[in-house]
Amino acid sequence: MTLQEFQNDIRAGIPDRLPAAKPYDKQINHAPKRKGILTPEEEVLAIRNALRYFPAKHHATLAREFAEELRKYGRIYMYRLRPDYEMYARPIDEYPCRCRQAAAVMLMIQNNLDKAVAQHPHELITYGGNGAVFQNWAQYRLTMKYLSEMTDSQTLVMYSGHPLGLFPSHPDAPRVVVTNGMVIPNYSKPDDWERMNALGVSQYGQMTAGSYMYIGPQGIVHGTTITVMNAARKRFSGGRKDARGMLFVSSGLGGMSGAQPKAGNISGVVSVIAEINPKAAQKRYEQGWVDEMCDSLDALVPRIREACRAREVVSMAYVGNVVDLWERLAAEEIAVDLGSDQTSLHNPWAGGYYPVDVSYEASNKMMAEEPARFRECVQESLRRQVDAINKLTARGMYFFDYGNAFLLEASRAGAAVMGEGGRFRYPSYVQDIMGPMFFDYGFGPFRWVCTSGRPEDLELTDRLAAEVLEEIRATAPAEIAGQLDDNIHWIREAGRNRLVVGSQARILYADSEGRTRIAQAFNRALADGRLSAPVVLGRDHHDVSGTDSPYRETSNIYDGSNLTADMAVQNVIGDSFRGATWVSIHNGGGVGWGEVINGGFGMVVDGSEDADRHIREMLLWDVNNGIARRSWARNEGAMSAIRREMERTPGLQVTLPNVADEELIRNILKENE
């Protein structure tokens, strides 16, 4: 397809003449069939809802087709409308547009649907089993058409993948405002999502899937590396200074979990990651994100012993069920140093977790046709997995929950994960590592995308970012010196670690000052021509301020407000009028529908004075909103960080807590008994 044909296809939106039906591509990784949850009347409603995108002359043809999709897959994806062109992040100048910011959004959307990047690209799912960009291909086509027509004085409104339309606004307003899964709280259970998604009225956007900010497995790899490195440091003794020879065991080689073997290599450990889906494991192997693949435990166990004995730095994919792996390691009495889990347990009944002793294919069939039995099998598997993990922790393994709802779903299954006082026996990685060491000080997963598509532009941004961090490190207080040292090392090595999958993007943990100064350095490089095209700034929702999630991002909030969502909602509102190009707010990212409120932004930096103003105003708020909240929760690192920010920033006045003596209160209450 020529560039002109591609641009014409974008501008056409939903074609008046229906394209030919598409064959089902068995080479692509597909979403499992969703369980049939709709009543006969609701099935009628789902098809009527889908037909709203098409003129009446096509209804007879499409109604029959959509009924078949609903029966066969549990959803209406409108496969017929899937474009014929290759889906990937093109250079920004190849997108037809009246507004360059809109072209940047188109680039980000296509990256999320690139088959090299997305988990189930033909079902418009980027990662996590159900993290969707759109619900169907009509929504994709109509959204791209609107973006091609948008001016700097319009805003596109997105309701859970549905483009509501272009509305008049102004150049400083967001170009796109995204909501995903925003439902009345009483209707936020997993089956509510199944029903509303099948009806075509809501979707689960995960974190960066439905917000157009996914950058492949790189998006989580810096955070995963930080976690593995600091978990390993907790095990250092006797003067040990590196992690070589340590064994890290986990599961998942999907969109986010696929970062684990690369993080293991960067951290210097032997990592063994189980993955039930052979296509997912093969994809990560071909992309260079895992070194070796093995589908036999009899072959894997001696290889693990050999690698640990030789202090190799190597990552291995076990293509099989994670429960089998844990049970074999426990039985063989192999010394596992670090353990975790990154199965998609936010989505346990629809492909996020596969039960032991049932094949991958049989599981996919069972979850749709026998959902109650599938649920029983999953819960039995969780109990067995936890039993094996408990045996290994009794021998000294450090196990941490990665915020994927593993401990939550294991507890619901009756697994032995509870400790004293009704608390989990294992910590969340945010409680032990990420929260007190990083989030409380404002460090989080800042990211950027070079819209030129040129590797040399990305290399320049890496150098600029490293220079900024080194300048900050020269005068930084001791309490954040270690974090800065690790982050400087990370960005210096990023190119050599071959992290790019899809768009020319980079992830870097940075605090408020670091993010702002790095973004300003990019803007200057654009203004003087050193960078050839705009840069998109963003972050994961898994950050200081963007997400209220009691089992992950806010699990180290102990004042009782961990179940509130004021921070995430305030954050997206504040970003929207301080210069974000697009903003998003979602239900359920990471831990699951009904368990989380999470949001994010995208900002197009183009070398202009307006861009510099937006950088200064928005990035300050986007980080310090969360630090202020964490400070009010009496987190010591956050109290220190927000005091430092108030000294640095004129006009910033934050309410600080007066910390009461807990023993004083307990004694007074005893007096009144």
Predicted features and spans:
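Long, compositionally biased, glycine/small-hydrophobic-enriched stretches that function as flexible linkers
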Residues: 1-198, 202-217, 371-521, 525-538, ...
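Solvent-exposed alpha-helices and their adjacent loops that cap or buttress functional pockets
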Residues: 149-151, 167-171, 186-187, 238-243, ...
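Catalytic or ion-translocation cores adjacent to nucleophile or general acid/base/metal-coordination motifs
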Residues: 205-229, 233, 244-247, 253-313, ...
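Generic recognition of flexible, low-complexity loop/linker segments
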Residues: 237-238, 258-261, 327-329, 387-389, ...
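Residue-level detector of anion-binding/catalytic polar loops
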Residues: 270, 335, 398
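Glycine-rich beta-alpha junction loops
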Residues: 278, 320-323, 342-347, 403-409, ...
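Active-site/ligand-binding-proximal alpha/beta "capping" segment
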Residues: 315-343, 350
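Small-residue-enriched alpha-helical segments and adjacent helix-cap loops
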Residues: 535, 539-570
